[in-house]
Each structure stands twice: as structure tokens, then as C-alpha cells.
């Protein structure tokens, strides 16, 4: 043992490959994933790739001679192909893995710079002067510029302390194992405190931890004076408040290169192992509580584990070095697993399933021969995920130890003391001591999802598995923030958690976490699939500040993943009244429990929740959580921020805030079903009805604001008796907007149908007229017939029935040559008819079925459309294209599961829109699972071959495998890029709002359009905006729209499709389409945005036929035309007289 003047042994820098004598920390540095930085750096490049040619330096096709092209492969190439076939399931996967590992690994140059910095750190530590011996409670020797990085409660403790230079300084952890990851490189340095400053009973009553903290404080003060370091700060080691570490960062250009963490530890054999068994007590009740425990001293398993973790540094490093030393595949596997954990936020803070645990798990599986050292990183990843998916360490723990020593605890004893059990080779230390059951259940669940994804061998499996982040707000249906954390002190008192507080050193958050989650899991019952929690890492702090208190650790956030089939249940059934379990049920639920008699005659305890609409039923967990936390944990609802339905307000009718419209949609669908039965049973038609199909967003539950039964107030209309219809009065506000719901009615085939397209149209027109007569005669329905459709008023809803003949699209395709030969060729008319009468009804039927399977689909699709239209981009996207985007989130949710609530689905919609590579990939929406994997591969190949002929956004369905019919007419490349940019901006803003424990603030922020980008703003008067109440910011008061609460004396056909702003827009586009683009939110927008087309300001040659909107000027002796802006702006106002309130020319944005 060296004396104060002797030079300590030092081990620095990376050890040679294969060296077995390395030391490791029990918990190597928690690495920040490279992709957090990469996302910011690469996002722009990803967008540039859509519009710009390949950047210089990217690989390009090479022209090879025929001899070079067909020459035999070399031995090296053959070996690589054979290895790829054995170790990876595809060449693409191997390339992706290799590229990812390149991104996260340290370069040799950076390693050399880090090694040099570590050598300098060692020299500085060796020069820190000693301190004379003093009592632990006498800390007057500490300089004024440093504070002890530990809460010393209780302050009085026996023992003495003196500082001596460390007996050994060792670089440990993932840096030496070559498994650390960029961009935030942390290097752990174990600083072994000399034996002479420790005493035999230092394991008792936090004495060891007090000495450890004082040792760090003295180091911190002296190292902070050194110009080598740009910053010297304290931090908690893996979130454990009893184990601070000292962070050192180099000065100058390498400031962001590395962070060195100094970790004091005791000599290897200083503590007697038998005293640190998890069943032992090392925190006396008399010392901690001020009173002795009359019966027995409770065990302190976590406290003992934290000491053992420091003791076992060397042992664990030896183990990992011997296993991973020269096995590159194992190192690659550990790196991939760390990426996997980080993307799922599983490795954060105290209790995280961190990189050290996963490294030890790899070593365990190697020892059990479930992993071989010759495996590739991908195979290691698969093997570990398979093990995690199929092994529940909360029930069946695992152990390195093969010892039969009776003095060692059994796995059963470990399970009594810890939620998750993974025992190290000593047989005494549980590596997962801090991991909660909830965290491990989440790890296991994610492993199951990942294995299913890998087994599917999807082309984008690697991207979804390792490159797609899964933040809690997107991964879980509901999120709960508990704030302030100080309230959990009352919870500990209510739940009588004194032993847990004693074990956790006063950390009331850790003490209460397990009991709280158990209560909520029991209360949510069959509704709950998974509960997770997130504790943000405690930030580092200055050495001259006191350490953060537990209440300053941020917020405790809980995430709930629900089972869709149980989420909306309004009753929790308990046992029968005469059963012994009934008393436990009443105690658990308190006053909410009541006796009820059920239809089968049974009298049972039950809890009934107040909820009628689907919106209210989705929020029943909110009632459960607030009730149980108040009852059992003394946490009032003022300390609970429940995030589950904030976005639902955007699709609520302002007059019906207790519903998000699913009931209104269901009412309209039932009315459609009734009408369908009437059509099927009609007897007065010459041909029978062969099929009735819906073809409207209402009938697939995706209409943003569902229609209500229309009961017109006739005082708002002039009546046209001869047509039995109404006409809006000009002196009244614009009446309510009524949109008819399209229904396609197929008639049976017959030889009487003509074979000429024009004749077919005439026959169809006759059927439309006859249909109106028969419906009026047989069912007394109000009908209005035209040549193309029949409008039918039923129960306040208007349906637009289109008669269809199955062969008409084919007849329209027939082209007759001069020689009389008939060939089939797609024409615009045939394609339009096929889309409207065949593809659209099939899509509506499929999406209707999707809604029955996933009740949240309606809310997700409607929120998505509400947001797109609120950005004034609704005209660029068809209803069907946005419905399919929403459907893809349910049919292809990987790496998630289908959302159970609209809020989560909308966040994922924004992520999909902003990250999908629209230029190089089609979005395949496999409705009803009709497309096989081979067919999807073929679709992607066909897409690449025909990319230049396809629209900028391509959405493929089983019925539309090539042409992307729903995006043929838009969006344009510019509109799509604008949507992508807006989604990329909105997502982080919205996520930050929803994860704010103080509440989301103004949730409508991301729905408000960016008006600053427009050249002209046309302001409309609300009097003539029929959907004014649907605005993102609904008005406090609006105009009466001529609707009665109850049906009037008679029922006339209301005015259909009357929306003055939309009619005005159509006029503007017709008149000025060559000069400007017009943007508007059809849901109550008060402003039309105008963008001048760049080409419109270019001088045009004079043409008398193109003089509209332009003025003639002379340039260079020639007459040219330029836009007459003043006249155009005046025309805007004239065309919209009575509707336009003002025209705001934002001339600072443009000049002629």
C-alpha cells in the first residue's frame, strides 16, 4: 500500500486487444445516441435529396468494360458473400449495419486525443495535496469554493476522514471495450481510495458514501484550478443520489470531444462480502429515523448493492474484457443493442436498462453458449432480443454464479427483495437491482415487437428497428405527469414506506415508484397492456453549489399503453357480495365501489364510471388514476397533469364538447344503412339494384366535422315551390353548409343496356329521374333528380345517389379505328368514372372496416385532415389520400403498435409525413392484407422503373397498384415540400407541449397557419362563412345559420354545397390561375392566402389574347406585359363584393 508520498499505480488508455487484466465500472457511461445529433444534421440533407442532384462525393454508377463486368469474383469477395449469407439475411442489411457502426464508433485519431487527455488527467490527480484527519461531521477544512456533492441527512455520523492520493487510477467501461458510442463520449475513470482512509464499519449508515463524496469534493476543488479543464462539475452516477461523480472536460477545441467521469471506489477486498448481502441491514433505524425498530432491522438491499457495485468494478471489467476482447461481432452486437435501447429511451437515469447491463447480458449468454464469439453483430442483436422477449426476469431470475455455497442468497431470496433479478458471478450482487418491474416489462415488450419486425424481413426493418426514435409521447396512448415531486413525501407517509426510504437513502421518488405503479396496474386492470415510467436524468451541477434535491429532479412521468378492447369499458366488476374478496375490493376502490344487481341475477361489487360518448370513455383511465392516487397516495388532482385528449378539442363541435363526433358519424351511417335497405327493396325500377355502396368520408368515419340532421328555418330562405326546394335570402347570414353524402347504386346487367357511351348516359339519366319518383311514391322521401344524380333527404341527412352501370367504364375505353377495329384505351372520362364508381366505394368499404377494427382511426384521420387544411393546404390533397396516410399508421405501425387514441396517432402522422422518403419510395397501404410480401417487392420495383411518370406522392393500395389514383391531381412538389416542412416544425413543438408537466399551454399553436409567407391576404366577413364555428380558434359568438332544434312543419330539400368562400375561390382560380396560387382553410377560415407565381412577374411578349390582369409597358423599345397589381387587387375585392372584408397587399415581400 503506498503512503501519501508514494506514486500510485496507474493504468491508462486502451489496453491491447485480448488483454484480460482490465478494470470496469459496474455501470459504464450512459451514452447519448449519435442519432440525436445526426437527426439535426441529416434532416436537411434528406430533404435536399428530394430536390437536388446527388452531392459531389456520393457513389455514382461506374461504366465497366464487358471483361471487368463479367470477371470471376476474387477469394475475398467470395468469402464476404458467404459470410453475408451465413451471418446476415441480406446484403442490404449488412451494409446498413456496417454504416451504422461507422457512425457511432470513435475514429483512431479521436481515440489518440482522448488517450493524451486521460494521461494529463492522471498526472493532475496524483498532484492533489493530502488533508489531515478530521471527523466526518467536521468539514471546516473544505475550501469555500466547493460543496459536498451529497445530501447529508441525518448529518450526525461516526467516523473520520483524511485525503490521500488514490492507490490506483484505472480507465474502465465501454471506452476500453470499444463499445462506447458517439457523439457524447464519456470515459469512466475508477479512482481507488487508499485503504488507510477507510475504516472497518464504513459500510454502516452512509459512512462510505460520505467519505466518497468528500474525496470527490477535494479533487474537484484542486482540479478546477487547472487550466487543462474547461469545466469541472458534479453529476450523479446513473441517477443514484448517494454516488456522485466528477465530470472533467478538456479546454480548447476538444471541449466537446469527451467527458471524463471520476468514480471513487474502495479497494477490491476492503469490505467483508457477508456484510453486504442483500438480506443484511446496514442503515440502522436508530440513526436514520431517530428511533429504534422494536422487532427487527429491515434489510437494505439497494443500499448494499450500491456499495457492492463500487467493489465489483475490477471483477466486472475482467469478465467483459475476457468475453468481448477479440470478438468483434460481440462488440458490434453490444453497440447495436445500445442504439436499440437509446432509441426506446430505456437506458435513462436511475433504474434504466443501461449499456452495462446489456453488455453483461451478452457475456451471460456467451457463458450459457446461447451466443458464440464468431457471431456477427446482427446475430448477437437477434439472440439477445430473442432472450429478452422470452425470459421474464421479474419471475425467473438468472445468475452467472454456479456456486453451491449455502451462505449465498438463492434466486428466490433475491426475488423477495428486488423486482428484477440478474445476479453477477459473485452471487451477491444483483445487476438489475435498480431496474423496476415496469422498466423490464417495457424492455420485454419492445423485444417482442423487435423480433416480430426482424422475422418479417421487411425492407425497412433496419430503419424501423434502429433508426426510428420511440419517444414516450408517441409510444404510449396516455401520459401522466406527477408534479411537484415533493408531493411523493406525503405518499410515502400514506403508504407507510419507511423501510424503503431507509434503504433508498431518503429518495422518496424511488421509494414510492414501485407501490404507485402497482396500484395503477391493479386499478386499470384489463384496460392496461403496459405501464412505463420516465425519470429525467438529474442535470449536472457546479462544484460550488449544493446537489439537487429530490424535488428538483424534474417530473415523474407515467406512460399507459392500452388494450383497445378494454379501454372504453365503463364498469369494473368486483367479486360477489358474499365473497371474502369483496372487502378487499371495497378497500381498494373506496367510495367508488357499490353493490349492483346484474341481469344474470348476481349481486356484485362494482365501480361504474361516468362516460357516455367514445371521447369520454377513452378518458376513463383519467378518472381511475386521479381517484386511486388521491385515495391511496395522497396525491390530489392538482399535482396530476393527465395528457390523453388535449388534441380532441380540434375535432369537437363547439356546441358538443363532450363528444368528438363518433356518435354523430354513427348516426349518419345508420341512416345510410336504412336508405340502403330501401334501395334494395324498391319495386318500381325497371332493373333491380345489384349493389349499394357508400362513397363519402362520412361513411368511412373520416369527415372532420360530421353532419347533423338538417332542420332548416324557412325564414332564412326563399321557397321555390315548383322545385320543392329553398334559396338563401341575401339579407340573411349564409345558411348552414350541407354537403350531400355520395352513394353509388349499381343496377343489374341487362341486354337492354345500350353499347354506346352517350346512350348509356341518357339511360342513366332516365334511371335517376325514375329513382326519385319511386322513392317519393313508395317511401315519401323528398327527392331532387338531375341527369347525373338524385338527392334524397332522409331523417335530416341528404344523400346523393349516383346510378352506375358496371360496363360503362369499359364502353368509355372503346376506341374505334377507321377500319372499324375496336380497341380499349384509358381515357380521362373512363378513369374518372372507374375511380368514382368502383375504386372509391371499395376504399370507403375497406376504411369503414378499419374503423370497426381500430376505433381510434376516425379521430386520427380527422385530426390529420384538420391540421392539413388548417395549414391552408387542403386543396392540394384529396380526402382519400389523407385517409390512406392515417390508415397506414394502423396497418403498418412498426416499430409501434396501432394507436388507441387520436392524439398519439396524430403525432405519428406528423412523423410519417416529415420523414418518409416520398421521392424514392411508394407508401404501400395494404388494406385487408391483400398484398403479399412478394407483390410489395414487385410494386417497389415497378415504382422505381416508372418514377418519372408517377406523381410526387405515390400511395399504393391493393386495388390501385400502379397509378396512385388518389394523388394523380396533387399535391405538387412544392405543396408536398411545404407540408413536409410544416410537419417537421410542428412535431417537436407539440411533443414539448404535451410533455410539459405544467400543462400543454395553447395546444392550437401548431394548427394555426403561417400567414407571413403569403404575398396578399384576403380577409373575409364571418357573416358569409357558413362553417365559421369550425375555425381553429372558434369564435365566442357567431351568426345564426338558419337551423331549428326540432323539425319544422314540412321538410324541403335544403340548399346543398353552398359555401360562398369556396365559390369565390373557384372564381379567383379561374380568373387568375396563371398569376397566383390561392390557399384557404375550408373549416371556418377567415383569410385567403395568395402567392404570386414567380413566372407572373417575368415580362411577357405582348399578346392581345393574354392582356387580362396585365398592363402593357415599353421595355427596350418593345411592348411587353407585366401584371397590373393594383387592378388585380381591385378585382379581388370586386369579385368578392359582400364577402371580402379587406385585401391586404404585403408589398414588402414582392416587387414588379
From Swiss-Prot:
Annotated localization: Nucleus, Nucleolus; Chromosome
Segments crossing the lipid bilayer: none
InterPro entries named among the record's database cross-references: NOL6/Upt22, Nrap_D1, Nrap_D2, Nrap_D3, Nrap_D4, Nrap_D5, Nrap_D6
Coiled-coil ranges (or none): 92-128
Keyword Thylakoid tagged: no
Any one cellular-component term (Gene Ontology): small-subunit processome
Region (Disordered), start-end ranges: 1-30, 36-55
Expressing tissues: Ubiquitously expressed.
Superkingdom in the source lineage: Eukaryota
Keywords linked to the UniProt accession: Chromosome, Coiled coil, Nucleus, Phosphoprotein, RNA-binding
Pfam families linked to this entry: Nrap (PF03813), Nrap_D2 (PF17403), Nrap_D3 (PF17404), Nrap_D4 (PF17405), Nrap_D5 (PF17406), Nrap_D6 (PF17407)
GO biological process: ribosomal small subunit biogenesis
Protein name: Nucleolar protein 6
Main function: Part of the small subunit (SSU) processome, first precursor of the small eukaryotic ribosomal subunit. During the assembly of the SSU processome in the nucleolus, many ribosome biogenesis factors, an RNA chaperone and ribosomal proteins associate with the nascent pre-rRNA and work in concert to generate RNA folding, modifications, rearrangements and cleavage as well as targeted degradation of pre-ribosomal RNA by the RNA exosome.
Assembly and oligomerization: Part of the small subunit (SSU) processome, composed of more than 70 proteins and the RNA chaperone small nucleolar RNA (snoRNA) U3. Interacts with RRP7A; required for NOL6 localization to nucleolus.
Residues recorded with modification Phosphoserine: 65, 292, 817
Family named by the database record: Belongs to the NRAP family.
Organism for this UniProt entry: Mus musculus (Mouse)
Main location: nucleus
Keyword Nucleus applies: yes
GO MF terms held by the record: RNA binding
